[in-house]
């Protein structure tokens, strides 16, 4: 698909700020600093549409990006080790759960996992939650350029087994802004 237009539609701190849309949405989820924003930029062939940072926890709102006026990509706050108070992390968790459970137009979730570390307990918990709520999911293994080809292939198999996936996760590299073919 050729991306003709892409822009920030809304940044929501609460469910009352979610845009009232009927178009399909794809959400991007994962721990803090795993590469959610980088993956979205890569898929859209944009370098700076979605703000990225080397500091975990920079995405603090649910950001809705309108693509070609026909669908939205949704950047969720990361979970895990962001250096913010526990109350704020809990409010993010509730906001994410509200979004994932209430959006009728949510067509799927891209779960992003750092290939070097594999799934965390929170990744497994989110995967179980998505399975239970019958939300379609695609797993992407980020930071694949940090490993050799052989180690990358081995890690993909481990992630597949650990998460009980039907197919291998898709490896992604931020260096060449693309999905890697193994």
Predicted features and spans:
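Flexible beta-alpha connector loops of hexameric P-loop NTPases
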Residues: 80-89
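Conserved nucleotide-binding/hydrolysis micro-motifs of P-loop NTPases
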Residues: 58, 71, 78-81, 116-118, ...
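Residue-level recognition of specific faces of alpha-helices
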Residues: 25, 61-64, 95, 108-111, ...
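Conserved C-terminal guanine-recognition region of P-loop GTPase G domains, centered on the G4
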Residues: 98-166
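Canonical P-loop GTPase G-domain recognition
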Residues: 3-12, 147-180
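Conserved G1/Walker A P-loop phosphate-binding module
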Residues: 1-76, 81
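Adenylate-forming
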Residues: 39, 181-182
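Amphipathic alpha-helical transducer elements in NTP-driven molecular machines
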Residues: 89-93, 120
């Amino acid at each position: 698909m050729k991306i003709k237009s892409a822009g920030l539609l809304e940044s929501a701190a609460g469910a009352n700020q979610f845009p009232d849309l009927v178009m399909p949405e794809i959400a991007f989820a994962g721990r803090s600093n795993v590469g959610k924003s980088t993956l979205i930029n890569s898929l859209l062939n944009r370098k700076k549409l979605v703000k990225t940072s080397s500091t975990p926890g920079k995405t603090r709102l649910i950001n809705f990006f309108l693509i070609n006026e026909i669908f939205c990509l949704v950047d969720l706050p990361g979970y895990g080790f962001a250096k913010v108070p526990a109350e704020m992390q809990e409010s993010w968790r509730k906001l994410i759960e509200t979004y994932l459970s209430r959006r009728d137009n949510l067509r799927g979730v891209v779960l992003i996992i750092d290939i070097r570390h594999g799934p965390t307990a929170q990744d497994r918990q989110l995967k179980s939650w998505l399975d239970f709520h019958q939300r379609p999911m695609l797993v992407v293994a980020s930071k694949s350029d940090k490993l050799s080809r052989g180690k990358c292939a081995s890690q993909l198999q481990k992630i597949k087994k650990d998460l009980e996936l039907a197919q291998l996760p898709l490896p992604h590299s931020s260096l060449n802004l693309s999905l890697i073919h193994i």
